[in-house]
C-alpha cells in the first residue's frame, strides 16, 4: 500500500506483483519444495505438516522474472497490481511430495505431523489481468520446473566422503 500511496500522492511510478508460491534454483528460506528435495537428498523421511490436503499453485522463478521484466517495459503497468502464478501447476502438498519423490527416484516414507498454525487451505492465483494487460503467461509446468530445481540441488550436493 505504501508504494501505491506514493504513486497516488507524488506520482512515483510503481507497480505491484503478487507472486504465488515461487520456487526454483537458488531458493533461500523455507518452502515445501526446498524442504522435500533436501530431505530426500539427506535420505530422510518426508515430513508433511497437516494432512497434506492444502492446495497450492506453484510458479517457477523464470516465469516470475518474465513478469517482472514485462512490467518494467510497460508504462501502462504503473499503478497496477498483478497476480503472478501458474494455475496449471495446482497440486495438494501431499501430491507435491509424491511428485518430487518420483522425480528423484526415491522411496522415502512420508510422516504426517500436526499443524501447529493456521494455514490457508487453497492458494490459486487468478492471472487473467496479467494475461490480458501484460500478455504474460507462465511457461514452465510443474514437472519441468521441479526437474530443473532438483538438478540444481543435486549439482550442489557435497560429494560422498
Model-flagged regions — what are they?
Residues 2-6, 36, 96:
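Hydrophobic alpha-helix immediately C-terminal to the catalytic Tyr-X-X-X-Lys motif of short-chain
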Amino acid at each position: 500500500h505504501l508504494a501505491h500511496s506514493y504513486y497516488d500522492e507524488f506520482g512515483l511510478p510503481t507497480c505491484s506483483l503478487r507472486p504465488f508460491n515461487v520456487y526454483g534454483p537458488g531458493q533461500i528460506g523455507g518452502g515445501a519444495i526446498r524442504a522435500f528435495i533436501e530431505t530426500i537428498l539427506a535420505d530422510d523421511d518426508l515430513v508433511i505438516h497437516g494432512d497434506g490436503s492444502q492446495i497450492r499453485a506453484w510458479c517457477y522463478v523464470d516465469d516470475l522474472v518474465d513478469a517482472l521484466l514485462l512490467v518494467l517495459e510497460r508504462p501502462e503497468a504503473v499503478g497496477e497490481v498483478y497476480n503472478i502464478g501458474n494455475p496449471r501447476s495446482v497440486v495438494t502438498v501431499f501430491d507435491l511430495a509424491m511428485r518430487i519423490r518420483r522425480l528423484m527416484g526415491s522411496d522415502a516414507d512420508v510422516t504426517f505431523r500436526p499443524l501447529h498454525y493456521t494455514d490457508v487451505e487453497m492458494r490459486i492465483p487468478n492471472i487473467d489481468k496479467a494475461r490480458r494487460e501484460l500478455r504474460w503467461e507462465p511457461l514452465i509446468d510443474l514437472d519441468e520446473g521441479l526437474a530443473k530445481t532438483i538438478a540444481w540441488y543435486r549439482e550442489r550436493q557435497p560429494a560422498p566422503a
